[in-house]
Curated annotation (Swiss-Prot):
This is Bifunctional protein GlmU. Its EC number is 2.7.7.23, 2.3.1.157. PROSITE patterns: HEXAPEP_TRANSFERASES. Mg(2+) binds at D102, N224. Residues 227-247 are annotated as: Linker. One of its GO terms (molecular function) is magnesium ion binding. Residues 248-454 are annotated as: N-acetyltransferase. It is an enzyme of class 2 (transferase). The gene is glmU. Coiled coil: none annotated. It comes from Shewanella sp. (strain ANA-3). It catalyses: alpha-D-glucosamine 1-phosphate + acetyl-CoA = N-acetyl-alpha-D-glucosamine 1-phosphate + CoA + H(+); N-acetyl-alpha-D-glucosamine 1-phosphate + UTP + H(+) = UDP-N-acetyl-alpha-D-glucosamine + diphosphate. Homotrimer.
Length: 454
């Protein structure tokens, strides 16, 4: 049977107090509904039906050109009515998995367990036991078998005492789902078409109903307001931090780290507090990352060090390279083995060769820098002429004095020395010494101006 996923994402989310549709509010810089979509893809979904309503334009803009079937729910008449909008894209032989766009922490392993629990031609529902089940639909059993789900507002005193609750997530055979949805009624306390009513129909039809449970109740928590959104964010971060520690990272304080993408770590990685990871970050063995650093879409090789408050974006650090504190590597920057940049050095589309150093206060853009090069404080590669970018090439073992400007395009030959305060506008040959600053003058008897008293 093909797996067909229906994601309900039509709600406005009034309690969010926002113009943004509820499901677009982010967890770890990714919308809640995108988390759900990604999880659906990860379990091998053949098709995803996204049932939408409020904020259609914003939803379509945010989710882009993904492989989704957009199914409009013009009126919000209940969960059963929402799922019914997807019927045109459901085949009789499909296994239909129903998910929710505001339940972002559901794990692939939980959904796989749910699908495995579904009997042939039967139903599987995801349930959880809560000490305080108030507000949730209760799982009604007779002699241990599920016979129905009753919503909070429709439950009697005996049913309200039940601790096993419905998460709303279920796996249903396509043909039966179509039949049951067609038989739904809105004759209930809320005047809605409850999806949960199909469970009683399944029981009445003699269909076997199994249950599965998540590893943690937080997986099935939704977010209806910003407080709950923040709680889900913290839960997500705790889960991701745990993965890093299991993989070999030592987190100084696991509660003070933000992971907003896919992070891969080697062994004995040290991560100080308030570090942010975004996008795809790959970190080797024995890497040290200082407090307040931000790593975005970057690769860090073994034994490298990122000192506090440095920003590494779209860049690479080679073996035993170091950056910071307060350094910035922008897209296309690369530090080769044993290379170092210090505080307030910025690089973009530039390579700093093996063992080369730029200790402080420099801008290196559109530059190819060889091995064993020293970049003095205040050095700037003047790479932009107002219209186009140009390349600076600094070959091996060059010494660049402090406060030097290199006006690109320009090449500095091997072993050359550039005197402090020079402005280099022409190529420099190998082993040459170049000084372009004006001759120093000594004016004796000169008096400094004084303020005129008024």
């Amino acid at each position: 049977m093909a797996l067909n996923v229906v994601i309900l994402a039509a709600g406005k989310g009034t309690r969010m107090r926002s113009d943004l549709p509820k499901v677009l509010h982010p967890i770890a810089h990714k919308s809640m509904v995108q988390h759900v979509i990604d999880t659906a893809h990860s379990i091998g979904s053949n098709a995803i039906q996204l049932v939408y309503g409020y904020g259609a334009d914003k939803l379509k803009s945010a989710l882009g050109e993904q492989q989704l079937n957009w199914m409009l729910q013009a009126e919000q008449l209940g969960t059963g009515h929402a799922v019914a909008q997807a019927i045109p894209n459901i085949d009789d032989n499909d296994t239909v998995l129903i998910l929710y766009g505001d339940v972002p922490l559901i794990q692939a392993s939980t959904l796989e367990a749910l699908l495995a629990a579904r009997p042939d031609n039967g139903v599987a529902i995801l349930t959880v036991n809560l000490s305080n089940p108030t507000g949730y639909g209760r799982i009604v059993r007779e002699q241990g078998k599920v016979v129905g789900i009753v919503e909070q507002k429709d439950a009697n005193a005996e049913q309200l005492a039940i601790n096993e609750i419905n998460t709303g997530i279920m796996a249903v055979p396509g043909k039966a789902l179509k039949t049951w949805l067609g038989r739904l009624s809105n004759n209930n306390a809320q005047g809605e078409y409850y999806l949960t009513d199909i469970i009683a129909m399944a029981h009445a039809d003699g269909v076997e109903i199994n249950t599965a449970q998540p590893q943690s109740a937080i997986e099935v928590e939704g977010a209806n307001n910003r407080v709950q959104l923040a709680q889900l964010e913290r839960a997500y971060q705790a889960r991701e931090a745990e993965k890093l520690m299991i993989a070999g990272a030592n987190l100084r304080d696991p509660s003070r780290i933000d992971i907003r993408g896919e992070v891969t770590v080697g062994m004995d990685v040290m991560v100080d507090v308030n570090v942010i990871f975004e996008g795809k970050v790959v970190i080797g063995n024995n890497v040290s990352i200082g407090a307040g650093a931000i790593l975005i879409d970057c690769e860090i090789a073994d034994n490298a060090e990122i000192k506090p408050y440095s920003i590494i974006e779209g860049a690479k650090l080679g073996v035993a390279a170091s950056a910071g504190p307060f350094a910035r590597l922008r897209p296309g920057a690369e530090l080769m083995q044993d290379a170092h940049i210090g505080n307030f050095v910025e690089m973009k589309k530039a390579v700093l060769g093996v063992g080369s150093k730029a200790g402080h206060l420099a801008y290196l853009g559109d530059a190819q820098i060889g091995a064993g090069v020293n970049i003095g404080a205040g050095t700037i590669t003047c790479n932009y002429d107002g219209a186009n970018k140009h390349l600076t090439v600094i070959e091996d073992n060059v010494f660049v004095g402090s406060d030097t400007q290199l006006v690109a395009p320009v090449t500095i030959g091997k072993g050359a020395t550039l005197g402090a305060g020079s402005t280099i506008t022409r190529d420099v040959g190998e082993d040459e010494l170049v000084i372009t600053r004006v001759k120093q003058k000594h004016l004796t008897g000169w008096q400094r101006p004084v303020k005129i008293k008024k």
